[in-house]
Amino acid sequence: FDVNSHTTPCGPVTCSGAQMCEVDKCVCSDLHCKVKCEHGFKKDDNGCEYACICADAPQ
């Protein structure tokens, strides 16, 4: 699953798949799931969590 291929146009900007558009501004999505991830959920460059996508182990 390529998280970078799921983006949303939002006025003059584009939101990542971990964000939603609110009045031409990207904000972290409030979607959650019950998956347990050993290293937490994957985050975008803004710190927003992707729902149900586990983060890789720290290097």
Swiss-Prot record:
Name the UniProt record assigns to this protein: Bdellastasin
Subcellular location as annotated: Secreted
Assigned GO CC terms: extracellular region
Domain Antistasin-like, residue spans: 28-54
SS bond list: C10-C21, C15-C26, C28-C48, C33-C52, C37-C54
Family: Belongs to the protease inhibitor I15 (antistasin) family.
GO function terms (MF aspect): serine-type endopeptidase inhibitor activity
The keyword Calcium is annotated on this UniProt entry: no
Site keyed Reactive bond: positions: K34, V35
Organism of this sequence: Hirudo medicinalis
Function recorded in the entry: Strong inhibitor of mammalian trypsin, plasmin and acrosin.
Keywords: Disulfide bond, Protease inhibitor, Secreted, Serine protease inhibitor
